[in-house]
Swiss-Prot record:
Key words, A-Z: ATP-binding, Chaperone, Cytoplasm, Nucleotide-binding, Stress response
Region (A): 1-339
GO cellular component, one term: cytoplasm
Source species: Sulfurovum sp. (strain NBC37-1)
Function noted in UniProt: Molecular chaperone. Has ATPase activity.
Protein name: Chaperone protein HtpG
Oligomer and partners: Homodimer.
SMART domains linked: HATPase_c
Amino acid sequence: MAKHQFQTEIGQLLKLMTHSLYSNKEIFIRELISNASDALDKFNYLSLTDEKFKEENWSGKISIKLDKDDNSLTIGDNGIGMNEEDLMDNLGTIAKSGTKAFMENLTGDAKKDSNLIGQFGVGFYSVFMVAEKVDVISKKAGEEQAYMFSTDGTGEYEVKPVTKDEHGTVIYIKLKEDEKEFLDKWRVQEVVKKYSNHIAYPIILNYTEEETTGEGDEKETKTVQKSEQINEATALWTLPKSELKEEDYIEFYKTISHGDDEPLTYLHNKVEGANEFTTLFYIPKKAPMDLYRADYQPGVKLYVKRVFITDDDKELLPPYLRFVRGIIDSEDLPLNVSRELLQENRILANIKQNSVKKILGAIKKLDSEKMEIFTEQYNRVIKEGIYTDHTNKETLLGIVRYKSSSEEGMVSLDDYISRGDSEKKEIYYIVGADEKVLRNSPLLEAYKKANIEVLIMDDEEVDSIVAPMIGSYKEWTFKDITTIDAPDSKTEEEKEEISKEFKPLTDKIKEVLGDEVKEVKISTRLTESPSCVLKDASDPMAGMAAMFAQMGQEMPEIPLILEINPEHEMIKKLDKVEDESLFNDLSWILLDSAKLSEGLEPKDKGAFAHRVASLATKAL
């Protein structure tokens, strides 16, 4: 019987379970029942699709045994079971668990952290909040040999061959002396009702009870073995909506989400006709921890006629809806459908299309308070959807929210349109990395003066790719204010006249700045600042941000255009400066200060600081 060391991360996790995550100990029952249910789902599928595993009288069940004399609790199932390799992979190493991700996402708040346990697939280890020792006895379906995995949670485990008649898994938990509450029938029943009432398999509680018979001298007390089913064991989504209360939906959500939080909203639909299916979807109040991980765990399980098929198919919903939790149950898909066939299956494509419309419809109907929560958690992935889902782009544009130059908080595009110019039908926006910099940008001055609202898109990494490809929404065209002329009351002739008048000055500044700018020209957008910079919209690279992002490469620098404000006192005086050194310094200050206003850095910060100090000294 060889002893093995737990991998480092699991050793740390065991220590954490034992000493830190003690505020919500009862969840170990939830996690072990959830694992048992998954094992039953897997065997149920095999028994229906593979002749080798057909069993005439098989009926999936989970058993819990309370033994007060032994101070132990046992949870068993007759599911698919595990062999030696499975036990070591699933319980002894990090390979198949989310241990590392779990450790990375710990907050230090014991209650919050205990709710993360199930989300990262490390639920088995929660048993060490209450266990002194654990034995996992398992026999894999179709194999002769059973194995026992044993550990006291201190860093070592051992696996040895044992005898077991039926396939499935039994987890024997020797409880710590101060955890006797989990030997109380009512306490265990309360936990099962709270977290696992709608697990689709019966949960049988085995316990002993003192019974007294007779009276007087014939009075006799004896210990009686009892068994009773303590959950409803119904697939909740198969019940008619009229029979379900909100509490039922919330209770079931807690079962599938491995947490205590209530969902933001849920939607339960049954579709009949040529393609029959039922869906039950939930939108969590808080985004899953792996929302932005490439290896995220999908949150939707696929069933065919109540038989579990998979919980690991990223094709059931589009990637931007990966935060959705729930169930799809089809009446028409074949039971033995392969992963490859799932991707091409017309029935599933129809279910997916219908599901997306229903989910987006439910999001659009959220009240303002819930919409605020949704936006805070999921606005970024909705933008992802705008970029990738052309079919539902218009609906997604109705959901996304942006900051605004005119309003506090986030605004919808419909809000913007309701306040905009219905003749021009234009939606103005500016993109950058810093909200404060964008709000103070000289590029906004003309829009503020004309009382025109501009959307502040400060998630540059995403907005710089998504915004340019939106095109329009409800026939309103998107306009990037850095690439168009600003609102101005001057005629074209007047603008041309001013440009001619200041051409010697703009040429001279360009000569000083050289290749640092592509062009220096008179601005129609500035009302307060002396200068501003913008990227050259005509540059071939300007519209290629998305392509470079997809290739994982940095965007090449786009040449800058420096615009100067002919109405500003500094520009008027600069036109009359004869001192070449002073003119050069002021020209560079015009460029560098404009760059700073847009969150860009001067080419030579030291030289910029020196010029400012020098001019300040002369002014004193």
